[in-house]
């Protein structure tokens, strides 16, 4: 005689093959008996609602991230190639074996950070490689109204591709106005060195003006032109104080009013934009390595740039932009500048560290030399750039056009 099949709870199974029990309505008995067998399926309407709400928040967050200027696809692919992608980057579609080079590049050049040299190189390269170099007739307006942002983004976005747009302008969020976010590049330098170069350039110009007996700012009063740099700093003149000293960070923070206020908010936002929207931010003190990396990242724009840069004729032209009549501030004045520019230095050192990490990934060594007797920001940099001056309109591209026509 066969034993009855025992129920896991100890009793005999009163129904074969899961048939309903007794007179219970069809399906009800089955439901009551099966739920204990599958405890992991138990959930309440509250649990269900919680899960759906969580999913909705995640989807909305993802959408807002993309609409607020998430990284361009090219930068995400590049992160994966370099081995420094984030969790979210890695869970997208894998990059192709050959990276599609971007056809929209913006160089929102920081004043007095080598941009004259780079623009001269770009003019030569655009003829050589056939890309569209887009410049602007406005050289002294970095902060834009909302309407001005929309108009500029529209003009840039409708340019013939591949294009490289260059202008002294604070970071623009194309995605905010419905445009495709381009890839950004830029170069910065030691903040005190940049400030000193600008201070004396506004007053005395460079070697081009010196040779042609040109006065850089004819409307400047003589007492202002010959104002001692130490007096300007120690007596807290506006030109040597904040917010005027808070100069580099806004180029990366953006157009928000708080980006012009020295503080942690602008600093952190600038770092975030560097990570998400800039293909490369180099430092002027290592310009050759900057050009080498640009040639590797953007060969259809920068192929052969290092050879052109090292050409004696080009270097001769570039050296004409060196600022003249620089003097060295006192150690006391320098320490005050350091204190006033602490956010600028925190950003500079962050960018420098990221740049060196990138160099190591490409097998480039960062040569650390012994510290000079004087601080390094007093050592003249061979190639300077022109600064957009707020109080005087100018055409800082004309000299490039004249040189290029020779």
From Swiss-Prot:
Lumenal topological domain residue ranges = 71-406
Q: Where is the composition biased (Acidic residues)?
A: 387-399
Hey, which stretches end up on the Cytoplasmic side? 1-49
Q: Which UniProt keywords apply?
A: Glycoprotein, Golgi apparatus, Membrane, Signal-anchor, Transferase, Transmembrane, Transmembrane helix
Highest rank taxon of the organism: Eukaryota
Q: In the UniProt record, does the keyword Amino-acid biosynthesis occur? A: no
Known glycosylation sites: 84, 140, 155, 173, 319
Enzymatic class: transferase
Q: Which Pfam families match?
A: Sulfotransfer_2 (PF03567)
| Outcome of substituting residue 115 to A | Loss of catalytic activity due to disruption of binding to the substrate 3'-phosphoadenylyl sulfate
Family classification: Belongs to the sulfotransferase 3 family.
Record function comment: Sulfotransferase that catalyzes the transfer of sulfate to the position 2 of uronyl residues in glycosaminoglycan chains. Has mainly activity toward iduronyl residues in dermatan sulfate, and weaker activity toward glucuronyl residues of chondroitin sulfate. Has little to no activity toward desulfated N-resulfated heparin or N-sulfoheparosan.
Question: What is the designated name of this protein?
Answer: Uronyl 2-sulfotransferase
This chain's source organism reads Homo sapiens (Human)
